[in-house]
């Protein structure tokens, strides 16, 4: 929050603010939760950067807490829980998501919360927790459709891992019903608008998907976790796979299934799977705990390396540098560059519009290049 007022609105935020002024049951590119929270911010704070960004900041904090709690469910002690929380807090994608009010921060939290519930059920066998899982999944799908993919992948993973009994019971079915209830408004809106999201996804797949996207996707995954801790999530994937618990292995299956799906068929951006690294880091922290305990200095060195690599990430993903000096980070993180220059852009457009003769101005139509430009003008 200390940096929330620096630079300006991100183009996604400009779009969400406009969506908040015209609330609907859903939208072409995402469900209603993000615009709804933007609407709450408008009512409470007006058009305010800190007021809009308080929600993703809170979501990021809760995701860090969830990372530590997931490690506890996997059997980790305080050291593993601390490492999991630190690993989550230093994820570049979470640092960036905490600063921009779009769907990403809430998506990270929802996935982490559902993984926490699944990990707990896998450890305790208490199926009543599926009710909480359904609520989490429902809120997640109200934010972003990716939660549907994650939930389905978990079910497939459970079946592949021999966990049919754990997902075929009345508590799971009740939880699934809760999740579906949250999805009904979105489905109703999509049906009324010729399934616009599916059409958009197909267009993205044609533009960015297929085999040509695999290389970019694989390399991009290396940047989801701070570089010094990248090997920890790999250890976590191995830990889950060898755990012997069907639901824990299902979480590993979900990662693998979605990795392939997003890489090959959806033209997905590299951060679409970022939320999975929260639970993989938590599992990895548990997996390497004995190794860290053998030599106390190892944890200190690991945290020092994480601090150094995170410092570099902070310069790239957060508005720390003067706005005039962010050009060198733009290729790595164009999102930060998209928070600069909107006020000048609007003044330029306004000046041109006002320079028109009154009769021409009355019928003039302004065409923009993207939703960010449109949102800036409408704001």
Indicate residue ranges for each PLM-predicted region.
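Transmembrane-lumen/periplasm boundary regions of multi-pass, lipid-linked membrane glycan transferases
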Residues: 148-245, 317
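Transmembrane-helix motifs of polytopic, lipid-linked glycan transferases
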Residues: 54-75, 113, 117
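Short acidic/glycine- and proline-prone juxtamembrane loop motifs at membrane-interface regions
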Residues: 93, 99-106
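Short helix- or helix-capping micro-motifs
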Residues: 84-89, 137, 141, 155
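Membrane-interface transmembrane helices that cradle and orient dolichyl/undecaprenyl
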Residues: 72, 114-130, 236-243
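Membrane-proximal, lumen/periplasm-facing interface regions of secretory-pathway glyco-
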Residues: 6, 298-362, 372-375, 379
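Transmembrane-helix signature of polytopic, membrane-embedded enzymes
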Residues: 67-90, 109
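Short hydrophobic alpha-helices at membrane interfaces in multi-pass membrane enzymes
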Residues: 117-138, 169-173, 177, 253
